[in-house]
Amino acid sequence: LRKVFELNGFIGIETRAVETGASLLKKGETSKEIYLLSRLQEVGHESDTPIEERLGLHFDLTVPLSRYVVEHSGALAFPFKRWQIQKVWRGERPQEGRFREFVQADIDVIGAGDLPDHYEVELPLVMVSALEELRAYGLPKATVHANNRKLSEGFYRGLGLTDVEGVLREIDKLDKIGADEVARLLTETCGATEAQARACLELAEITASDGAVLAAKFDALCEAHGIVKDSEAYTLARQGLDTLAMIVDEAAAIRPGSVIADLKIARGLDYYTGSVYETFLDGAASLGSICSGGRYDNLASQGNRKYPGVGLSIGLSRLVSYMLHTAGAHANRVSPAAVLVAVWNEEDRPAANRIANQLLSLIHI
């Protein structure tokens, strides 16, 4: 992974494990995932300190990156492209494929003030290239499924729905709980009528690997539900549609079949503002998404200056677990050493050491 990231111009960094509660809560409804830290002498008195002022273990690598960029903005060259492979901690219930401590592999591009849309094509292609390297170890082919928050939001507002974040959170559950249950939740928690819920599910059914086909399907659905093209809602949706069509078409020109438009992709976190991605492996539907991310314009700022970004993240521990237990990957040697210098008896050890050192001197690390 690191080799592919660096070939594409990404710089490796490592950030501290501990962040302030205020930083960790930037991503929205994530408090249940955060492990807070206390000194032993403070146990029982933690409630005296607001969560925002306490320290906790980072649950992803995006929040630490946003803090890092703001702190070091004067020394960074923008757009800042970074890779990071590091442990994170999350309040999960341990089970197969779910860990409280695990390794993530992230790539992000951060701009200063603005960030061109073409990075929303570049990042999924880099990640697909990196995952392609793992096919030698039994990993199936990976495909990125992309959507755009503006497209979804514009469509929902065109239907007359106001709780857009709520709708996105429920649509994000579609693969887990099914269409009927999502429709029920949309009516009960988001104030949708049955017709509006049905329209949301119809949008989620749209997939395409061609920008023109995607636009035709979307416009037909808008027309069927009375969303007119001169409305503010359609204008917002069209911005997202144009970006998504560009991603699909440009990705197809470079690496056919690697990225498709899939309008059920929602990403429940509320800080995404544009493209959103989920990545699936062929023949491994039960595994779910193995790599996800999106565009965020408001996560990092310094005064009036914003640092928009786009990123993707692999849950590496979960992926390696799948490769070992399902895909048939295995260690091909018990030691990283490629040569064994045998020692037949202790009298021969000095000579063996000299031979080993001579061999090592020939290797350029």
Regions found by a protein language model. Give the residues of each.
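Amphipathic alpha-helical blocks
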Residues: G9-E14
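Positively charged, Gly/Ser-enriched RNA/tRNA-binding surfaces
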Residues: L1-N8, E19-A22, T30, P50-E52, ...
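Charged, often glycine-rich, active-site loop that binds/positions anionic groups
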Residues: G21-R39
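Acidic, His- and aromatic-enriched active-site or binding-groove loops in soluble protein domains
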Residues: E33-S47, L161-V182, L281
